[in-house]
Amino acid sequence: MIPRRTLLSLLVGALSAASLPALAQQSPFDLGPEQPGRIRADEDPAAIAAVPKGFKFVEPGVLTVGISPGGPPLTTYATDAKTVVGADPDFAQLIADSLGLKLNLVPLAWADWPLGLTSGKYDAVISNVGVTEQRKEKFDFSTYRLGLHGFFVKADSKVTSIKEPKDAAGLSFSVGGGTNQERILLEWSKQNVAAGLKPLELQLFDDEAARLVALRGGRVDVVVQPHAQLVFIAARDKDIKRIGTLSAGWPLKSDVAITTRKGSGLVDALTLATNNLIRSGKYRQALARWGIEEEAVERSETNPPGLPKY
């Protein structure tokens, strides 16, 4: 029997694929399967040499990467409803190029990546996985993006910038109930009240569409959710704009990383390859292609401090 969680994830993927023609017509990015604008890299001798001699890839000569098509611009299905495209697939291609390997992207339900990785189905997972102390017990990480939430407002809003709690005093926000964003904004509100400032007003919604309706209808001043999603919506609809970003682990930094099996030996080569891609400029070009340069890291780290349990 297929687990209910997996079945729901697959159903969401199928529904997303069914809506691809309409999505492609509206998309500000190239969602075609050919991807002629994809950034490519040369082989990186240093990174190749860092792969342990005894390391066995799932398929010889191929980097097999588990990836979850959760939505643009990070990862989604192309207009052929089978090719996976987006910022994470582009980054995976750069890593495969650097290691002198072909790339095989294997779509998966996001909740299934830990089991798939530990069971040896994939060499790595590149799918918006955040570094946490709990995950570090079983996996190795090479960071490649910042985990950010975005503050977005209507294009004609008088709210121009949110960088810290005091900037949000007295404003109303649409946010997902039970999310990390809600946790952070509640703490911001407490800090403001303690400082004699107005609290934040939070309106909780279960889905993105409702949050955006609240913003566009003037019920709230600001919408808060994962940054990349809002970048895509802003570029597509042109009626909202970014006024700030927020670490997904505030007050701590939140890292997104290539994930590999603990002790597999591949992590050092992946970190080295990523840093050389950063130095060459190709890394930032790949992020810019999907509008998420704000999420660029200055350098890749191996197993940095991860977020604690909240």
Regions found by a protein language model. Name each.
Residues R4-L8:
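N-terminal export leaders
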Residues L146-V153, A235-L272, I292-Y310:
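Periplasmic-binding protein-like
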Residues L94-S98, V106-P107, A111-A124, K138-F139, ...:
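Short helices/loops that flank or line small-molecule/ion binding pockets
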Residues D112-L115, V129-K136, I184-V193, G217-L252:
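A ligand-binding cleft/hinge motif common to bilobed small-molecule-binding domains
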Residues D30-A47, N180-A195, R242, N275-Y310:
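Ligand-binding clefts/hinges and TM-proximal coupling segments of bilobed small-molecule sensing domains
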